[in-house]
């Protein structure tokens, strides 16, 4: 930690098979972010990309194979989100699920995961605020607010949805 008297550490504890269920809007970045953490901890993966971005998933898979990822460490399944996502969460060999997508689907996956004693992490479109303090550079803040809200047409889970401004 950059703060004195604070200790921050990470423990790498493999869980086994981790399912990654990812959205269409960042078809390479989000799977790679999720996979990196799971792989570093010693897990194997089952990657279920969005139905609208199978080609990106296929290219990523080919790159990983060419780079030498061991057989069976990176696995991909293609198909409709509802039935396939539910099947992954309920599968006896899947220990954990990481999902990015809608509130509706994330809520259902949480419930299914709890019923099957799974570790479930869902990112379901946070309500992200930009906070402007009295000493803020207003030009910079205005630019950051607009970019945060409208970059990628607002179709990202980290989009700014409100501004909190001091009086």
Predicted segments, located by residue:
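N-terminal Rossmann NAD(P)-binding subdomain characteristic of aldehyde/semialdehyde dehydrogenases
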Residues: 1-35, 69
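Short gly/ser/thr-rich secondary-structure transition/capping motifs
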Residues: 1-5, 78-79, 144-145
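A structured beta-alpha segment of the ubiquitous adenosine-cofactor-binding alpha/beta core
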Residues: 7-9, 75-98
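Beta-loop-alpha module in the N-terminal Rossmann-like domain of NAD(P)-dependent dehydrogenases
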Residues: 18, 25, 80-87, 101-108
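General beta-strand structural signal in soluble alpha/beta enzymes
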Residues: 47, 76-78, 99-101, 120-123
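ALDH superfamily catalytic-core signature
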Residues: 90, 96, 104-167
């Amino acid at each position: 930690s950059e703060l004195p008297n604070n200790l921050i550490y990470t423990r790498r504890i493999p869980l086994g098979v981790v399912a990654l269920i990812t959205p269409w809007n960042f078809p390479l970045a989000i799977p790679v972010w999720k996979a990196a953490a799971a792989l570093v901890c010693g897990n194997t993966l089952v990657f279920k990309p969005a139905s609208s971005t199978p080609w990106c998933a296929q290219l990523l898979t080919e790159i990983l194979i060419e780079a030498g990822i061991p057989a069976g460490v990176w696995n991909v399944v293609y198909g409709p989100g509802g039935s396939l996502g539910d099947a992954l969460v309920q599968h006896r060999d899947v220990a954990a699920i990481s999902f990015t997508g809608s509130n509706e689907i994330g809520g259902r996956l949480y419930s299914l995961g709890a019923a099957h004693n799974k570790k479930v992490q869902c990112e379901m479109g946070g309500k992200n605020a930009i906070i402007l303090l009295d000493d803020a550079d207003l030009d910079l803040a205005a630019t950051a607010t607009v970019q945060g809200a409208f970059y990628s047409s607002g179709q990202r889970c980290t989009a700014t949805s409100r501004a909190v401004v001091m009086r």
